[in-house]
Amino acid sequence: MSLTDKEIMDGVLAEFSNLAAIPRKSNHEEAVSNFLKERALSFGCKVVQDEKFNLIIDKEAAKGCEAWPRVIIQGHMDMVCVAAEGVQYDPLTSPIKIINDGEFLRADGTSLGADDGIGVAAAMYLLQQDFNHGPIRAIFTVDEEQGMTGAKALDAKYLLDAKYLINCDSEAFDMLTLSSAGSVNVDAERRITWHKPEHRSAYKFVVKDLHGGHSGEAINCGYANAVKIIAQAINSIMKKTEIELASISSLKARNVIP
């Protein structure tokens, strides 16, 4: 296999464009899972789709390389679905509109889904190539963004017969990270007493247009958090006068700094 960097990039981006056309919100990955399954079968790969819609795709070793160790290429199919204020976007039905300015890809008013669409796209491109390789397995899981329920449900037998696992969900360019990873979700509840408002004046306090970012990758960057700003503002106001709080809300995605 002898390909130029441009040929490889064009091939990966073509696979990514396929993914961008398919809505794939967390816990709604059936359509994209079915698409990838059929596409991998068309490459001559063997495919297992489990009840969670995780995919296990096996590419046989090249001739003469059967004794080489198995390598797993792993990514996830779901994406964080957010849109700018005023943008009409339904994460269950709307495709992602990609804008390519020649240097960067971005989406038109929504999240792009490169996490982890570009990782899945790279793996799908690799599965089509003819080169000297041992057995390759691509594993694509569901619901990584909200709870990793796909990874938790994956049968361990698909991991134990491989020597290497390469996760294609890193945030750093041109870098490999040797580590393990995990996540913890914390749900907190507090009982409150509702009552009819006594004050006639109502005010809406909005914090927007902040930097934002991924709560894992950018949590140490010191970016302002809209929820914290609102809480601090309410606390300051309450020290000076009595207020009644009707509601407070933020982005639905757990892993986005609001």
Question: Whereabouts are the PLM-identified features?
Answer:
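Acidic/His- and Gly-rich active-site-bordering loop/insert found
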Residues: 2-103
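Conserved beta-strand termini and adjacent loop/short-helix elements that scaffold enzyme active sites
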Residues: 50-52, 141, 248
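Active-site metal-coordination/substrate-binding segment of hydrolases
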Residues: 65-146, 151-155, 162-163, 202
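Midchain, well-structured core segments that form catalytic/ion-binding scaffolds
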Residues: 94-97, 101-106, 110, 145-146, ...
